[in-house]
Structure formats: C-alpha cells, structure tokens
Regions:
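C-terminal output helix
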Residues: 105-114
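Two-component/phosphorelay signaling modules centered on CheY-like receiver
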Residues: 11-30, 117
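Receiver (REC) domain active-site loop signature in two-component systems and cognate sites
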Residues: 56
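Active-site beta3 strand of CheY-like receiver
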Residues: 45-51
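Short, conserved "switch-loop" micro-motifs in signal-transduction and mechanochemical regulators
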Residues: 83-84
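Acidic catalytic/metal-coordinating carboxylates
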Residues: 34-37, 60-63
C-alpha cells in the first residue's frame, strides 16, 4: 500500500483517481487543486507517490514537479496530461517525472503505473 497525493484541478479526475487508488489498496492522504498547494502538501505529508496533472492554474504541474524534485530528488511523481502535449511530456521527463498517464486515462494504466513505482519503493 502506498500513501498518495493527488494533484489535479479537475474535481472529476480527483474523484476517479481517489476511488481507483483506494479500490487497489492505496491510501490517498491528500488532494490539491493547484500545483503550489500540491507542493506544500508534499512538504508537509511526504507521500510515497504524487499523481500530478500538468495543466493547472497558478502553478502548473511542471513547475510543481520542479519544486518537489528540488525538495526531494527521489520523490516519485506520475504526470497526467491531455493527449497531444508532447512538449510538456518532454519537459516533465527532463525534470524527473517517473511515469506518464494520458487523459482520458485507462484505469488499468493507472494501476500499472502505481504498482510499478510501489515495487521499486
């Protein structure tokens, strides 16, 4: 079981992710709707894994990823992005993202990405 922080400005995406993760035995310890809030919750709670939407208001997922990796270079972050954002995905790899999931996401893909990281913890 992993402790997971879900960062996404879409209430629907957060709800789906939370339900899916909990169904698979993981604990969603917090949610955030903006990247800067996600970063602050990361610093406070130190989750095992962060799922991070790329496109969010104020501080986007790429900026939040950089902040989290600056705080802890070993942080495990799964980026979630809309299809067609190849340049954003390249940036996220540059800044240390562990996995990518494309919206609309396939539930099995999410579980596979989480389990891959859990196995390496």
């Amino acid at each position: 079981m992993a402790k997971i922080l879900v960062v996404d400005d879409s209430r629907t995406s957060r709800k789906i992710l939370k339900g899916l993760l909990e169904e698979n035995g993981h604990e969603v310890i917090a949610e955030a709707v903006k990247g800067d809030d996600g970063y602050l919750k990361y610093k406070e709670l130190h989750p095992d894994i962060v799922t991070m939407d790329i496109t969010m208001p104020v501080t986007d997922g790429i900026q939040a990823l950089q902040l989290i990796k600056h705080e802890n270079e070993k942080a495990r972050v799964i980026m979630i992005t809309a299809a067609g954002q190849k340049e954003k995905m390249i940036q996220a790899v540059k800044y240390g993202a562990d996995e990518f999931i494309t919206k609309p996401f396939d539930k099995e893909e999410v579980v596979k990405a989480i389990n891959k990281i859990v196995e390496s913890l």
